[in-house]
């Protein structure tokens, strides 16, 4: 299975994610953030489906310049949608790392949507095995709020505070 194979490309994703979230506060203050190129194609790409979704999520949350490295005419429709999301909604959120000093690569990125101030949180698993992360969702969303994952549509209650993630995946939680 694709998810089980060893991936030599994935480490750069976590390192770039560490850099872009740790430097996010400088975006539009000292410079315009310039993360790495977005790659969504299936051919000539070592990233798994989960890793591509994780990378897209990170770019969506931090904003900044968007460089697409794919020919839209050759992209599978579901992959083209990932790139279109980034192009249609640049600088959608104002994000920051909640766990900046708790781990080498921050895994919990809180954000507010710039258009209306609605809260959002990205929870990332950059590790090579499944993780259950404790996330203080109540402080971000309030008590008893139903949250929905942007990618899967799954819902959880903010009171749970536990987010289970397979390796190299993420969720983007917003109010349902």
Predicted regions and their residues:
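Carbohydrate-binding surface patches
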Residues: 55, 59-62, 67, 102-141
């Amino acid at each position: 299975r694709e998810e089980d194979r060893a991936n030599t490309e994935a480490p750069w994703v976590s390192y770039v994610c560490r850099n872009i979230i740790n430097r996010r506060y400088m975006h539009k203050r000292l410079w315009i953030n310039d993360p790495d190129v977005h790659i969504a194609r299936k051919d000539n790409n070592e990233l798994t489906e989960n890793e591509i979704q994780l990378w897209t999520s990170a770019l969506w949350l931090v904003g900044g310049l968007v460089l697409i490295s794919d020919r839209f005419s050759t992209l599978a429709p579901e992959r083209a949608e990932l790139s279109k999301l980034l192009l249609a909604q640049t600088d959608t959120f104002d994000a920051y790392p909640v766990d900046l000093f708790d781990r080498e690569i921050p895994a919990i990125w809180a954000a507010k949507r710039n258009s209306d101030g609605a809260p959002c949180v990205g929870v990332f698993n950059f590790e090579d095995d499944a993780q259950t992360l404790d996330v203080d969702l109540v402080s971000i969303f309030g008590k008893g709020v139903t949250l929905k994952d942007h990618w899967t549509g799954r819902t959880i209650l903010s009171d749970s505070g536990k987010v289970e993630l397979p390796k190299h995946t993420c969720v983007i939680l917003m109010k349902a």
